[in-house]
Each structure stands twice: as C-alpha cells, then as structure tokens.
Amino acid sequence: MKINVRGSTMVRPAEETPRVRLWNSSLDLVVPRFHTPSVYFFRRGEAAAAEGGSYFDGERMRRALAEALVPFYPMAGRLAHDEDGRVEIDCNGEGVLFVEADAPGATVDDFGDFAPTMDLKRLIPTVDYTDGISSFPILVLQVTHFKCGGVALGVGMQHHVADGFSGLHFINSWADLCRGVPIAVMPFIDRTLVRARDPPAPSHPHVEYQPAPAMLAPEPPQALTAKPAPPPTAVDIFKLSRSDLGRLRSQLPRGEGAPRYSTYAVLAAHVWRCASLARGLPAEQPTKLYCATDGRQRLQPSLPDGYFGNVIFTATPLAEAGRVTGSLADGAATIQSALDRMDSGYCRSALDYLELQPDLSALVRGAHTFRCPNLGLTSWVRLPIHDADFGWGRPVFMGPGGIAYEGLAFVLPSASGDGSLSVAISLQAEHMEKFRKMIFDF
C-alpha cells in the first residue's frame, strides 16, 4: 500500500492555555511508554456525498482540533522530567501533529476484517523517540483518504497522558466541535485525586505487580550461550456473534443458585482456555491473565466526570493451566473472583503499594509480561469507541492499530450494535494456527 503525504501541521491550542507542569500519578507512570495506536475507518455514504463539500476536510478538522486543545491543554504539551527524574507533562502548548495523506491504490474494503496488522500501523504517524521524551508530540494524528472515498483516522496517543477512557473523551470532544456541537463534559485536570494515602498503607500483596510466571520447562542448552531469536508472531481478529456468545454461556451451570458471570469473564475464560491449549501448556504450568479495569467508578468517592488521566487498575487471575483448560465455568469463576475483588479498598491499596516502590519503571508491563504462558485481555466494550462523528457519519470500525506484544489481546464491540464481540490477538505463529481452530469450537 502506497501512502502519499499531502502535508503535516503542528496544531496548537486556539487560545492561550495554562503554562504548568502537570504531576503524573503512579497510574500514569506504570503504563507502556510508547504511543497507543488506534485506527478509525469511515465509509463515504450517500448522505455525506449529497452534502457536498470536502469529505473529512482538513482545515475544518484542524480548526476544531485547535479548539479542543484549549480545555484539553495537556495534549498539546510535551513530556518532561521533574527535579527528581519523575515523568511529568510540560503543558507548553507546542501542539499535536496532524497529517493528511492519500492511499490512491487502496480502499477501505482492502483491510478486510481490520485485523491490527502492519498495514494498519502505516495509517498512524511514526514517532521518533531518539531525541528524548521532550522531543516528540504527545498526540499524532493522520487522516488518510482512499480511492473508494473512505477515510482512516490514525491516532497515536502517548499513554502517560491518558488511558482509553480519557483518550476517547478527547477524540469524541474534538469530533463534536468539528460538527458544531459544544463539548458535553469538560476535562477535569488534577491528578492528585489518585495520589496515595499519607502514609501509604497497602492492605493486599498485589499480585498484579508481581513478576509474571515463566515457563516451567528448562531453557534449552544453546540458550545458555546465545540468546535465541524470538519466535515469529501472528495477529488476527475473530468475530463472535451474539449467538456464539449465547452458546458459550450455555456451557455454564444454570438455575437457582448458579453463580453469575459477566460477559467479559465468560469470553475471557474461553480465550484464556484456547490460548493455553494452543500453546500446549502442561496442566501444572502457572498462567496469569491481565484484565484492565477502570477505577473511575470503583474508587469511592468516585472521580469527577471528565477526570483526565490514567485510572486503570489490573485484575490478575492466576491459575494452573489445568484449571484454565478444564471447564469454562472453572475459568470464568477464577476470572470473576479476581474482578470482584477490585473494589475501592483494593484500588486504594494498589495506589499505596505503588507509592512504596523504589522504581515504578520496573513495573511497566511489556513483552516479558504477556508472553507465553501468560495473556493480557483488554476490553474496549464499555468505551465509546464508535462515537467519533466529525460531521460525516460514525466510523464503521475502530480498533487497535497494532498489537505490540505476543500474548496481548483486545475485545471490541460491534459498530452496528448487533451484540457481536471481536477478539484481536497476537500469538506465536505456530500457536495462532491452533488457536484459529479452537476459538469457534464450542
């Protein structure tokens, strides 16, 4: 796929904004340090064609973006270090990168089921990290026009500034302004609300921040002298219909007194089971599942509407593979128990635990966290991922623009609201071949 860049602009806030250094909470610092990639796809429908004018007009989008950056001013800043070396946000108004491009030989249909492959990654501007954390924009955007008339909006958002909920709050507010609608909820920019207690008093061991289990099998002899190349990975996406999800639930105990499991717990148990079987994990192999949970409503008192930052706490069910690959009910019970534990007391304890750690960077999750035998499964089902209507209609798809690590997966809702859920996942290529056969075998 050939992409021609029409032009790129650094868009600054439309008005003067506060010149401050924004303190980051521990939750803002235990996230991956790169830009989180996501991509929206839009089809040019009859209504947009009849309206006339320029579809996804760059000038209109830039004006709205500049307006949005006034209340969301940290987005226009740069990362910096305070005197103790802690990462903070320098709200200096230097702006966000906005790129316009064409893919004259491609159509929206060419992306098929929108699996987060390298083709999707090319729809997002590349960030150069070589000159230090203050050298690059916190937010990079690219509007790519296809020959079919459709458009992709690629988003790269530095994770220190926002989690999924806050990131979408910004994107959807920008879209509202672009179609002439005022921002519904203004951002609340004060991260001290998720500061640890004084003095910190963690009341749980917080297994979520403990090292991930390693494979029980010993390293092969050659690994002692030379580091082997990591096995090739594959990325795919699988759509489970409402009927599929119903058939999964039918495997669980029913009737009076039967335990209740969330849809996430049921689907996560199925994905964890399939991945463990595809990986050939022995029954005694410990495996950990990382489940991102939003703390906004879990913390008491709850955070203000529009709280802008990271409020992700992680539930981490841990079990031997034999339990995970057994009945669906066993896996779902393990997951639901971990999720139910995530109340305000647990979350406050997690903040205190993080405050006592000498080096938060040691807790940042990465390839070492999610790789075999472990798994990360992040749900975007409750996020408003399809609400970005810039004035030319809602997206037909929104999802990750890439999956950085083997063993990481995302659950996505359907844009049509048909009750289906899609699982985008990265696994070792040989494991993916088996996973493809298992995911619909129930």
From Swiss-Prot:
Task: Tell me any Pfam family this protein matches.
Answer: Transferase
Q: Which Gene3D superfamilies match?
A: Chloramphenicol acetyltransferase-like domain
Q: Which InterPro entries does the record associate with it?
A: CAT-like_dom_sf, Plant_Fungal_Acyltransferase
According to UniProt, the tissues expressing it are described as: Expressed in roots and leaves. Expressed at low levels in stems and seeds.
Q: What are the recorded GO MF terms, alphabetically?
A: acyltransferase activity, transferring groups other than amino-acyl groups; hydroxycinnamoyltransferase activity
SUPFAM superfamilies, per the entry: CoA-dependent acyltransferases
Query: Is Ion transport included in the keywords of this UniProt record?
Result: no
Q: Which UniProt keywords apply?
A: Acyltransferase, Transferase
According to the UniProt entry, what is the EC number of this protein?
2.3.1.-
Q: What class of enzyme is it?
A: transferase
Q: Where is the active site?
A: 159 (proton acceptor), 389 (proton acceptor)
What family is reported?
A: Belongs to the plant acyltransferase family.
Q: What does this protein do?
A: Hydroxycinnamoyl transferase that catalyzes the transfer of an acyl from p-coumaryol-CoA to various acyl acceptors. Can use feruloyl-CoA and caffeoyl-CoA as acyl donors.
- Name listed for the protein in its UniProt record: Hydroxycinnamoyltransferase 2
According to its UniProt entry, this protein's organism is: Oryza sativa subsp. japonica (Rice)
Q: What is the lineage of its organism?
A: Eukaryota, Viridiplantae, Streptophyta, Embryophyta, Tracheophyta
Gene name in the database record: HCT2
